[in-house]
């Protein structure tokens, strides 16, 4: 039984292992690959000091990296703060400050806005 959404990739990898989990722009990922990427990303966030209850802003366009980041944040028990990529820089600033984000994950094309 799963206790939170951060456990979904590991449970799916256990059940479906090398079956296709995600296809994005011609690239295919197995359930094992997604879980491994989530583990690595969660480890990186943990190394940065992110712990359960911290808020992490996710500011990125739709991509496989967004999915991995989403589950990595959840895996740590941190709060996911997804931000609409259509917001203006001042709106993004407000959202990030208002939620008390400890970290921001942004795609390269969005970094300039923050």
Question: What do these predicted regions represent?
Answer:
Residues 2, 18-63, 67-71, 88-93:
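Conserved AMP-binding/adenylate-forming core of the ANL superfamily
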Residues 5:
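Conserved donor sugar-nucleotide recognition element shared by glycan-biosynthetic enzymes
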Residues 9, 68-69, 114:
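Aromatic/hydrophobic pocket-lining residues that form π-stacking "cages" and hydrophobic walls in ligand
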Residues 11-17:
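Flexible acidic/glycine-rich loop/turn elements at helix↔coil and beta-strand↔loop transitions
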Residues 16, 23, 77-81:
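A generic, residue-level signal for flexible/boundary positions that often mark functional hotspots
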Residues 47-48, 75-114:
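Structural core segment of the AMP-binding/adenylate-forming
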């Amino acid at each position: 039984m799963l206790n939170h959404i951060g456990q979904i990739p590991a449970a799916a990898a256990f059940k479906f292992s090398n079956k296709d989990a995600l296809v994005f722009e011609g690239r295919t990922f197995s359930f094992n690959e997604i879980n491994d990427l989530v583990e690595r990303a969660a480890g990186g966030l943990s190394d940065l000091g992110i712990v359960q209850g911290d808020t992490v802003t996710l500011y990125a366009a739709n991509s496989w990296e967004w999915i991995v980041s989403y589950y990595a944040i959840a895996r740590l028990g941190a709060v996911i703060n997804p931000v609409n990529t259509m917001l203006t820089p001042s709106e993004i600033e407000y959202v990030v400050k208002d939620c008390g984000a400890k970290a921001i994950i942004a795609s390269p094309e969005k970094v300039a806005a923050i």
